[in-house]
Amino acid sequence: MSKFFIDRPIFAWVIALVIMLVGALSILKLPINQYPSIAPPAIAIAVTYPGASAQTVQDTVVQVIEQQLNGIDNLRYVSSESNSDGSMTITATFEQGTNPDTAQVQVQNKLNLATPLLPQEVQQQGIRVTKAVKNFLLVIGLVSEDGSMTKDDLANYIVSNMQDPISRTAGVGDFQVFGAQYAMRIWLDPAKLNKFQLTPVDVKTAVAAQNVQVSSGQLGGLPALPGTQLNATIIGKTRLQTAEQFESILLKVNKDGSQVRLGDVAQVGLGGENYAVSAQFNGKPASGLAVKLATGANALDTAKALRETIKGLEPFFPPGVKAVFPYDTTPVVTESISGVIHTLIEAVVLVFLVMYLFLQNFRATIITTMTVPVVLLGTFGILAAAGFSINTLTMFAMVLAIGLLVDDAIVVVENVERVMSEEGLPPKEATKRSMEQIQGALVGIALVLSAVLLPMAFFGGSTGVIYRQFSITIVSAMGLSVLVALIFTPALCATMLKPLKKGEHHTAKGGFFGWFNRNFDRSVNGYERSVGAILRNKVPFLLAYALIVVGMIWLFARIPTAFLPEEDQGVLFAQVQTPAGSSAERTQVVVDQMREYLLKDEADTVSSVFTVNGFNFAGRGQSSGMAFIMLKPWDERSKENSVFALAQRAQQHFFTFRDAMVFAFAPPAVLELGNATGFDVFLQDRGGVGHEKLMEARNQFLAKAAQSKILSAVRPNGLNDEPQYQLTIDDERASALGVTIADINNTLSIALGASYVNDFIDRGRVKKVYIQGEPSARMSPEDLQKWYVRNGAGEMVPFSSFAKGEWTYGSPKLSRYNGVEAMEILGAPAPGYSTGEAMAEVERIAGELPSGIGFSWTGMSYEEKLSGSQMPALFALSVLFVFLCLAALYESWSIPIAVVLVVPLGIIGALIATSLRGLSNDVYFLVGLLTTIGLAAKNAILIVEFAKELHEQGRSLYDAAIEACRMRLRPIIMTSLAFILGVVPLTIASGAGAGSQHAIGTGVIGGMISATVLAIFWVPLFFVAVSSLFGSKEPEKDVTPENPRYEAGQ
């Protein structure tokens, strides 16, 4: 094949150009993400039950739906949370690889079975089923710069004018408004109702009857009488539109003809649908809408589309209102991708310099360098065909591939120059002769390296997604590299290399290259003597190898484990929790203190603070608060102002708050897998011990966790039990008084809850009508005495006649996990510890809890647990595949052993480098480790294959090994140094994505240094020892050519 293209160099150029063109076009179409879709697909069900407690929502809604969800294909786990404001969310998480559209259809079908069993009030509110991830993509805020609009005005504007276009934007999965639109609020006065012998039920019935839209038909509609000349639509009664119209609703006509209207017993006006949440941006009145990404959607494309949507809406904003993005996860995507691209360019430059240093021929260096853009651009084309994206994982793989892909070109160019020098052939003929010698070896080495990485492509789960990105990218680059080395590089050699006279290649050079060559040759001579000494004294070095293996095993056990390294995402969360039962006003005081500290004391780091009162990730309620903190760009912050340093300083300050618990935490590396770094676990009531016992177990767990030196910031992702007023109805007494239970329940729901009646029209938009008691009539238990129910005789009976109450405790938020009541706990490893060690400590503490209490990992912790169980199998498969490929390559079961034995020599260096830098054994480390294994095997192949052929030609094992080492030292050092320097930019990276770059670069550099330095001494030992052990015959007479050369070009 190579001969064909050597004779037709333009044909080779055309193929190379086509490959680059296809790759360039693919880059324009490839989506850009920080990570691929690592998180498993999730479907969320959202429901609201106005006026219901968390327990009521759980008993009447959550469990009904959960029981119907059983039997859905590929369902991994189901979690739910019920809140005291009547809201509820059930999240069904599926196995990685499940089609989210299919999952949503299956969930919807199961939900249809449950809907008729739900309370009527829930069905009236509607049930939302969305494809969504757990975290927010970004928050869009509206802030009143001049204070002319209140938070309620802004929230109404968002819901009325922005919510719909935002929800229609491609890629938006779900959203949450921090506030509510206007509703027609009817505030009942119980004294006036009693005065007119009316009840809340009467008012609701009258409003429902008189605020209606009637379809009145037509005059002259078909079929019509002959001769009909008129056709007109009849406009009947329509929905009310103003507070004045509602005040005129007729409630009662007295015997004397006087009328009682709604305005006589209630205050009517526009107000919020609910008042649970309020927001501020840098202390100014604001409202916001948090957007969640749809499963499988592109983050950058979605964020760009949302910004364009907002830009189109801005001309219609009220005066003094400005749109802001107080929380945005996409800048880190562009910054991290940009950083890796710079790393890629730096790697190419460093590899070029190393090649030029060793080849000492500018034309030869240019030839090898020209293969880089061809292979890299071609790889992008393969990524597009495979449905991948441009992300940090594929870009890291590109960086790792640079050192591999130039290696094939180096082998071709070096061998062509050797043939020209030894045989005096012109470039074209020398290239043909050279390619005949090395074609098989090029393919063989590519197969071995692919064997190391291909098993990664077949693993499942979120970890499997990460492995596949690396595996497919590197293997594709290597495949293209071999193709280019067989087609394009020979054509370049035949046309670009200058002819060499016989022996000219080895003539001494002057200047720097002469100095370098002389010193390198002296090193080669010393190396040759050292190898001879090792082969003459095998036992001490075999024992040293055994010690290296033991050290490798010890380091593996010692290095802490993790899933992914932490990253500075440029955003920080702060969560506020005031004592149970605290008012919103009390919580706002703490929120203000927190914001003041961040904007003043951390002004060099913090760009903006968006605070929310009434909501946090732990739950909703007046005792909850949240801050979304945007940091300044990475290039404006030093290491002392990283997100982790800020979180630590902020947490120390927040510990001084006496009236609240405030936690500052950074988001995880993969935002799709949760909202916080560290671990995520559910304590479960598997024994049915009840809420109180589960709460006791939770508190016991938190107490023990606080004493552990391994754990930090351990907190419940829920709310503490708070005071609740248990109202008991005496059914017998009520019956004796002639009061029905239905009237009692309806009166309570309307007066103390917020009862939805129907809808009205406000400025062309349909909004809701709510009836509720005025605030002064529902502030304390004594206010219940103000409310009356009419009995069968028409008499007004006070609640005090048949109801009594007592104070108790209950949870404002209830969680369930896989069908049982549960409590979520979040936390992080203490400084100096990894998430793997923290998870082991959590399991130890959970094992000491009372019987009936179990635990389950979720989110990123679930994925980390899964990845840890996969690592040994992946490692073993990779080594096995290498062995099998080598056995096929050499037609021998013994020779591959000499190559495989080099694996620990690379691993030990990766472990030492990772340990010295304080990094963890995570997914990136494992990818780097497997790459190191492949490269270490490649270096061993260069020596073993050459030694094997020399031995078959009649050399002794000893002489064959030494000669192979001497001849292959220079290319081994050159390719290894090129690879190491190509990865150096990863290890010294800073800014966005630096954690991942350090994790993968450190292990690879350490592994390659040890694999190169140690392998060149131990590989000949392995070759001789294994060959002797398996009975390789020594020649009868040693043949020592004067100028031994490796005719295979290896």
Curated annotation (Swiss-Prot):
GO molecular function: efflux transmembrane transporter activity; xenobiotic transmembrane transporter activity
Membrane topology: Multi-pass membrane protein
Transmembrane segments: 10-30, 339-359, 370-390, 393-413, 440-460, 472-492, 539-559, 871-891, 893-913, 923-943, 972-992, 1004-1024
Subcellular location: Cell inner membrane
InterPro entries registered for this protein in UniProt: AcrB_DN_DC_subdom (IPR027463), Acrflvin-R (IPR001036), MdtF-like (IPR004764)
GO BP annotations listed: response to antibiotic
Family matches, as Gene3D superfamilies: Multidrug efflux transporter AcrB pore domain (3.30.70.1440), Multidrug efflux transporter AcrB pore domain like (3.30.70.1320), Multidrug efflux transporter AcrB TolC docking domain, DN and DC subdomains (3.30.2090.10), Multidrug efflux transporter AcrB transmembrane domain (1.20.1640.10)
Top-rank taxon, per record: Bacteria
Primary site of residence: membrane
GO cellular component assignments: plasma membrane
Keyword annotations from UniProtKB, A to Z: Antibiotic resistance, Cell inner membrane, Cell membrane, Membrane, Transmembrane, Transmembrane helix, Transport
Function per UniProt: The inner membrane transporter component of an organic solvent and antibiotic efflux pump; confers resistance to toluene, hexane, p-xylene, ampicillin, penicillin G, erythromycin, novobiocin and tetracycline.
Family per record: Belongs to the resistance-nodulation-cell division (RND) (TC 2.A.6) family.
Protein name in the entry: Multidrug/solvent efflux pump membrane transporter MepB
Provenance organism: Pseudomonas putida
